[in-house]
């Protein structure tokens, strides 16, 4: 009989699932009896595996409401489903899931699923008002990691974060990434004139402000080059101002479907990712699939993927001058970017895991944790 697993997190899902998410959950369902407690992103479909929570208005209350009620919702799901394990995406979520387990008074394992630095969301994401929540979030994260029956990490960096809290990871393996749209065709030659591409949310943790400052320094040195920004977020004014100042050398697209992101990478010389915090950097793997090198900050999980001078150029986080210098090199030295791109395409091979392999790793994690937890 399959183990029963409850996935818990703030992730937003729309039903019916997209083809890539359908692959992931269908593979998981082959190995485990999977159920999901998460947020509703809209949609008119139905899937018995999903219990999605609708948002509340005003939007500023949506997050606090979700987390305040999460222990009670987890407790309800545990009582109804009797899962063998709860996989909580995030350290704070693991603490709240552990509280839900106590409320339910049902024996089940709680596994913390760590994809980044638990301290980052209240310091670098969204509104500055989040900073006031940092002490509470830090306390919750520590309780979540230390109270979990197991911890899964996705990289050497996230493993280091967990060990810093005095906890040894139970397993380390990458998140499932549907890379098929980025592998359907062979990488295209680098474009001419050169283009630097940024893909991500326009938030402080992605350091869009640093990128804007760097581009003001770099643009005059590479007058035929363009910076293409893809994303939206609370720092949209930073992007808008940059386009207004350098309209001939800056483009901004708020939303691109996944196939169009692949095309944007083909039309780019290099990807730029100047983050202040980054768990892994999925877009780096996508860029590697398209044979593109990366200019990025030496922070978080980025150095776990990008080898400085081989598959990309790494600079100190927050250093606009160093970032500008790296961009000028990448956009003016075609031989360098061709070499970085060729090495990147080779380096991506270990990341090309099928959904079935990911599902088996999750199953093995659940078996390992449930098998070692005292009854």
Label every PLM stretch briefly.
Residues 308-309, 313-320, 329-335:
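Conserved acidic donor-binding segment of nucleotide-sugar-dependent glycosyltransferases
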Residues 6, 152, 188-206, 212-216, ...:
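Conserved donor-binding/catalytic core segment of Leloir-type glycosyltransferases
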Residues 24-26, 72-76, 118, 131-151:
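Membrane-proximal helix-turn-helix segments that form the acceptor-binding/catalytic region
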Residues 335-366:
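A charged, aromatic-enriched C-terminal amphipathic alpha-helix characteristic of glycosyltransferases
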Residues 276:
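Aromatic "clamp/platform" in nucleotide-sugar-dependent glycosyltransferases that forms part
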Residues 293-296:
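Short hydrophobic beta-strand element within catalytic cores of glycosyltransferases
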Residues 1-43, 374:
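N-terminal subdomain of nucleotide-sugar transferases
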Residues 240-259:
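Nucleotide-activated donor-binding/catalytic signature segment of Leloir-type glycosyltransferases, i.e.
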